[in-house]
Amino acid sequence: MIYVIDHNDSFTHNVVHQLALFDKVECDNYNKVSEKKIKQASTIVFSPGPGSPKNYPITSKIYKKFKGKKKMIGICLGFQHILFCEGAKIIEQKKIYHGYQSNIQVVNNKSLFQKGKIFKVGRYHSLKLKEPFKSNNFEITMRCLNSKVAMAFENKKEKIYGFQFHPESFLTINGNVLIKKILSA
């Protein structure tokens, strides 16, 4: 079972729909999380949402408690939140990307995806990872071709993955392939 933690975002319903193609999905609001469901889940997904990771201390507690015990995936705010919990600074971008399609490229040969591969993805974010960023076992694996902003990370050892973009968006080509690969890792 996949347990989605919803950060009050309309995209969460699309995320749930996409994940349901691969497994049973349960979804609860971040302030009504069920520890019983977390324990039953094979994967925890931190959804997109408004604001900054610092606005969701409950999500930080969940991440820290289950890190290394459950596979985790962060999407958009969820991507930022995982990195924030790992000590990263999340900052405003000069340009806001809401409903914007970008080309991103796999830049790391340790990635689950083939280095050099290019994907078209849907972006809906005004914040980004401030770099350089270093944390044990975390590798930036995809970047925007134009801006070089980090678009994905992987921590294979602890099975923690993140996408700054929205794999469930109609702007993302082959989003199901990306999710399936992460879920099967």
Whereabouts are the PLM-identified features?
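Short, charged N-terminal beta->alpha structural module
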Residues: 2-21
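Active-site environment of divalent metal-dependent phosphoester hydrolases
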Residues: 11, 127-130, 169-171
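A short, well-structured beta->alpha microelement
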Residues: 20-37
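Short amphipathic alpha-helix with an adjacent loop that forms part of the alpha/beta core around
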Residues: 33-41, 133-134
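Cysteine-nucleophile active-site neighborhood
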Residues: 43-111, 120, 179
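Conserved hydrophobic/aromatic beta-strand scaffold that supports enzyme active sites
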Residues: 101-103, 150-152, 162
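Catalytic beta-strand/loop cores that center a nucleophilic Ser/Cys/Thr
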Residues: 110-158
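Acyltransferase
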Residues: 167-185
